Amino acid sequence: QEVSCFHLSTRTLHVTDAIVGIESTPPEIFDFDPTPLLFHSRDRGDEPILDNVESRKKGWARIVLFSSFLKPGKLNIPSLKQIIKYSFKEGLRNKKSHFGIYPFLWDEDWESSLVEIMGENIPKIQIAPVLQNLIFPRSKQVLLGWLEKIKTYENMEYLISAHYSAPINFKEENCQNLIDEINSDKWNKLPDDNKFLVNLYKKLFELGIIPKKVNV
């Protein structure tokens, strides 16, 4: 269930999941422990975990792809033999490096998917990709009606979402841009990345896990 409210005194729209702003700089919370970023920045299990700005941004970009698509189109799952090839070798016998186990194999052009969902220095405002494919296929008109209502809030200036960058600038024109995108061909962007989510949605619907009736 999506919950949102408009805080009048700060002119800020608070949302749970539906609208997010994604940028290339990792959230500051990773400064306490950047290990997840550094782990995902590698291409093989035997690569050392090096802490630098480039590795943090690379790891963050891949985490964004995971959270947006669950199984991105540019990601392959290697064989078990490849996964454990470097495990438990010297220098890798520790939890931080996950003992050299690395079950991911990224295509060389994996970064191409980021163009549509990540801003370089300014958060890219969008409907959360995972919800776009798992929740909103059957409730597109409900989503549009909600955005039309939000657009009427006077003096709206900021957005705080439960995920990714916050607060970010968010005004009537940003809301209208989302509406226009939903009503355009761009709404079905990145078909290769969305393939897993689309198939998952169909399966959940067939099993009755996703109810046929839309609750508003």
Where do the model's predicted regions map?
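Core dinuclear metal-dependent hydrolase active-site scaffold
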Residues: Q1-H14, A18-I29, T35, S67-F69
